[in-house]
From Swiss-Prot:
Subcellular localization(s) per the UniProt record: Virion; Host cytoplasm
Disulphide bond pairs: 52-102
MF terms (GO), sorted A to Z: metal ion binding
GO biological process, one term: superoxide metabolic process
A GO CC term assigned to this protein in UniProt: host cell cytoplasm
Record's function text: Superoxide dismutase-like protein with no enzymatic activity.
Keywords assigned: Disulfide bond, Host cytoplasm, Virion
Gene encoding the protein: OPG175
The protein's name: Cu-Zn superoxide dismutase-like protein OPG175
Family the entry assigns: Belongs to the Cu-Zn superoxide dismutase family.
Source domain of life: Viruses
Tagged with keyword Disulfide bond: yes
Length: 125
């Protein structure tokens, strides 16, 4: 399991990468964005020493997230990404090729509450 903490200006969130029932899932939530559609993209480097300017070129498009009128996005996406290959890279939230927020993807421990959340959502409840 991997996790990315986003904390840039007023944009905050937690994104998990987790295998669930044989499929890799991306899940979490993000707050602080304006209503609309945004891109989740994995970048080459996990270097955030200069914010999102030092994370390198985009490598993998994960998918779109949809921010509601309250500024909240609930993320639940399927992905073909091999989780072990993205550890140490960066995840960005972008719109119109502008990187709005980013964070480094790291290894996470298995949390029973997260597994319960995944199981509930996998079953459509």
């Amino acid at each position: 399991m991997a996790v990315c903490i986003i904390d840039h200006d007023n944009i905050r969130g937690v994104i998990y990468f987790e295998p669930v029932h044989g499929k890799d899932k991306v899940l979490g939530s993000v707050i602080g964005l304006k209503s609309g559609t945004y891109n989740l993209i994995i970048h080459r480097y996990g270097d955030i020493s200069r914010g999102c300017n030092s994370i390198g070129s985009p490598e993998i498009f994960i998918g779109n997230i949809f921010v509601n009128r309250y500024g909240v996005a609930y993320v639940y996406l399927d992905t073909d990404v091999n989780i072990s290959t993205i550890i140490g890279k960066a995840l960005s939230i972008s719109k119109n090729d502008q990187r709005l927020a980013c964070g480094v993807i790291g290894i996470s421990y298995i949390n029973e509450k997260i597994i319960h959340f995944l199981t509930i959502n996998e079953n459509g409840v």
